[in-house]
Structures are given as C-alpha cells and as structure tokens.
Amino acid sequence: MGGCCSCLKESQDDATVLPIAENEREAVTSLLGYLEDKDNYDFYSGGPLKALTTLVYSDNLNLQRSAALAFAEITEKYVRPVDREVLEPILILLQSHDPQIQIAACAALGNLAVNNENKILIVEMGGLEPLIEQMKSNNVEVQCNAVGCITNLATQDDNKAKIAHSGALVPLTKLAKSKNIRVQRNATGALLNMTHSGENRKELVDAGAVPVLVSLLSSSDADVQYYCTTALSNIAVDESNRRKLSQTEPRLVSKLVVLTDSPSARVKCQATLALRNLASDTGYQLEIVRAGGLSHLVKLIQCNSMPLVLASVACIRNISIHPLNEGLIVDAGFLKPLVKLLDYNDNEEIQCHAVSTLRNLAASSEKNRQEFFESGAVEKCKQLALVSPISVQSEISACFAILALADNSKLELLDANILEALIPMTFSTNQEVAGNAAAALANLCSRINNYEKIIESWTEPSKGVCGFLIRFLQSEYPTFEHIALWTILQLLESHNETMLGLIKSNKEIVKSIKRLSDINYENAQKASSLHSRLQQVNGGSVASGSEQYEHASLELYNITQQIMQFLN
C-alpha cells in the first residue's frame, strides 16, 4: 500500500493543494492507522468506511486519489458482498475527470464485481453509465479497467440484457480494435459474455461487432482468438445470424479452418464448434469442404482430446448431411476413424454423431456402401445395438433401416447376421428404436432371392420374425400394424413355399390379420360416412383429418385383402 500511503501525505502540486478540513485530517490520520493494520479491520463498515467516504467527498484531489487507491487495494484483497454504502462512494469517484482516480475506481469496482451479488447491485445503482463513459476515455489504463469491470458484470445473467441495451456494445466493439492487447482482451472477453442469449446476440450483431470479431481471428494473441472464435460460434447458433454471416463475411470459414490447426487446444476446439454451428446450413456445409476443412477434421476425430473429438465429429456429422459431400468425406478417409469412435462407450454423444455420420454416408452411392461394409461399421453397430444408450440405439436402428433399402445390401446384411440385433430391437420400449428396427427388418424381407436367413430366424432370437410380426399386428398402433402387414405381404410375394407355409400355419398371425381387416374396413366405412356428412354440411369443403383417416384405414384394409388372397 506504499502508493496509497504516499498519496495520503501532503502533495506539493499547487493544482491539488487545497485547505484540508479538520474532519478530513482526522479521516487521513484514522485511515493511515487502519491501513497499517488492515487485516484486523473491516473496510466495508464502521470507522474505516467512514474515513474513506470522507476523503471521497473532499474537494481536495489528493484526498480523492488516496481514497480511490485505498479502495482499489482493499477490494483486490477482500472480496465479499457489500451494500450500497460501500458502492456509492466508489461510483462517485468513477465520475471524476482525473485519470488516476478513474483508473483506481474502475479497478475497485471491477474487483467487487467478481461477486455475483455485487454484480447485480452495481448495475442496479447505475454503475453502467459511468463505466461506459470511462470506456470512451483516451487513457488506455482507464479503458482497460472500465472494460474489465464490464466483462465481470456481463457474466451475471440478470445483467446481460441491461448491458446490451445500455449503449455499451458500440464502445466495447470499438475497444476490441485497440492496439493495447490488455484492452483488446478485456473488450473481446466482454463481447463473448454477451453472446449467451439470442436477444443479446442480435444486439451485438446490430452494434457491428461481427466484422471486428472476424478480423480478430487473425490476432497473434491466443486469448483474443479464443474469445472471438467462441463469440462467433455462439452467434452462429441463430439461423438469422448465419444468413447475415454468409452475406457479409466471405473469409470467415477459411479463417476458422486455419484455426482448427491452432497450437492452442481451446482455440482449436472453439473454431471447430463454430464450423459445426455454421454447418447447420447447406451453403456452409459445402463451403467448409471447399475451404479444405475435411483434412483438418479427419485428424481431429482421431486426436486424444475428448472435447476436440466431440466437436469435430459433430461438425462432420452436419457436413455429411449434404449429398454432394458424401463421396468426398469417404475419399478423405473418415470411415474407419468414425467406426473407431463407436468404442467411446463413456460418451454417447460422440457415438451418436459417429453413427449418424455413418448413416448419411451409407445412404449415398454403391461405392460408398461397399466401403461402409468393408470398414467394419455393420459389425460394430451390431455389437452396440442392444447394449448402448437409447439415443445411440436410435441412430443405429436408423442406419440399419437406410442400409436395408438398397437391394444389393440386403443379403450382405443378412449374411452378417443382422437379425440377431434387429429382432430384439423391435422389443424396445422406445418407439423410434422399435420402429426403425422393424422398418429395417421389413426392408430385408422385400425383393431378395434367398430367404434362408429369414426362415432360420422365424422363431429365434427373441421369438424371431414370427414374434415380431405378432407383436406389431397386435400393437394397436397403426404405424406398427402397417409395418407388420407390409412385411407379411413382402414375404408372401416372394412365392417361397416354406415362407408361405410358416405364415399360413400360424393361427395367431392369420387371426390378427383378419381382425385388422375387419377393424379397418369398419373404420374406413365410418370415415367415409363422416366425410360425406361433412361435405353436405360444409358445402363441399371437408376437414382433412377425416379424409386422411379414411385413406389410412383403406390402405391397411387393402393390404389385408392382398394378404388374404395368398392365404386363401
């Protein structure tokens, strides 16, 4: 506290020498005593606070400086919730035109703003307005401390909207371009703190922050790069912002791709997350590939950092959605690394993104499908199908359903004993998993020239294909009933005598088909009658709901009739 004590001594500067009132002399004497033994005093109440407040309200500039410096040192060492009586004199000092006082007062307020309760109270007491004024100062130290305080205040959710609407964003954006690295770090950190809600992100974009953030991606300072990449990643969450970015920031993607190779792990991760968010849009999905992003991402999904692996596999998952990217991703060598990611049993998010990407790639060309099988993806997915979390099972079942659509994949899947996984998956309590698995099973029963694997699995595992059909026929869920009926029709249309015999001889299957035939005939009749009445009442216009219900019932009824022709 040497600086503070020296300021409490008499100054020889004529401009600051004013008569000192008796109460001020007493305050100086008391304060010196308190500071000598400061660990034993509470400076936020009683005598110490009274002495400081007396100096704050003095007309003597030296005494005001002493108070400001004392507050700066005390608040740096002792941070806790304080009341209005403590903040009020600091806010008074903040309005001073003296740079020394401004620097110390901003520092004191910034120190106290580490505490959440203080953050709220500072803003409630009008602390933003003088801080904004100090940000406009020509003094770099004043700028740095004022922005640092705003940065701390902006970490409190209750304050963010108030800061966004206070007029602080424009000067913050201006200071982000400062040549002083400390000011720049504080300003970009404050801008980052303002990107955690959609409304605040809009205010930030409107304040012109985006071009500044993009330009600073090329900064040589890792902290500034991190703040800017993270802020842009958050801004890119919003579709409207992504549209603006695509129209105004042509170099954004190439800069982010470069940063995915940054020596700083956190910059690398945030750049990848920013690309992932941008890749929610089809235009960016193509642009990232054109900018050379694949060669970086294929390395990242094989690195040892779980956050980086997660960010990169989420990014490639979004990129793989675009059909034009599928072949390029396969050619870039992603298949085997993606299959290896399925071993992340302690991170279902990584597994989900990996399977989802594999599903997108498997659905493309014959060449990609062949490489998919050769990569070991089917076997690995089969191993995980019954033991992974529901979210992963959902992706795996969807992947199987897509693969089973291709005629030239069906026998390969059956030879891989895929039914060992698919049939038990139809038992899942999760409708999406059960439905996807059933759809895959139905597709595998359609248009194949060898039904040996289907026949072998008629009763096993888990009561086999037969058990699946009975459960779905009796599910009273139209989608599942439709899948079961369509599967039976495909099996019958194969004209395989063994298959026909297995279905005809199963009384429960035949009984369930007849029941669905009767129910859907009756439902179609009722829907048709309602349809006619509604036409009469409404003068020809009909509610679409009754019409759709009639069509659905008719479709199920028609399938049952086609099946009955085979059975009779």
From Swiss-Prot:
This is Vacuolar protein 8. It comes from the Eukaryota. It comes from Eremothecium gossypii (strain ATCC 10895 / CBS 109.51 / FGSC 9923 / NRRL Y-1056) (Yeast). The lineage of its organism: Eukaryota, Fungi, Dikarya, Ascomycota, Saccharomycotina. One of its GO terms (cellular component) is Myo2p-Vac17p-Vac8p transport complex. It is found in: Vacuole membrane. A lipid is attached at G2 (N-myristoyl glycine). A lipid is attached at C4, C5, C7 (S-palmitoyl cysteine). ARM repeats lie at residues 37-74, 75-114, 116-155, 157-196, 198-237, 241-280, 282-321, 323-363, 407-446. The gene is VAC8. The keyword Chaperone does not apply. One of its GO terms (molecular function) is identical protein binding. It is a lipid-anchor. Keywords: Lipoprotein, Membrane, Myristate, Palmitate, Repeat, Vacuole. The keyword Membrane applies. One of its GO terms (biological process) is nucleus-vacuole junction assembly. Functions in both vacuole inheritance and protein targeting from the cytoplasm to vacuole. Belongs to the beta-catenin family.
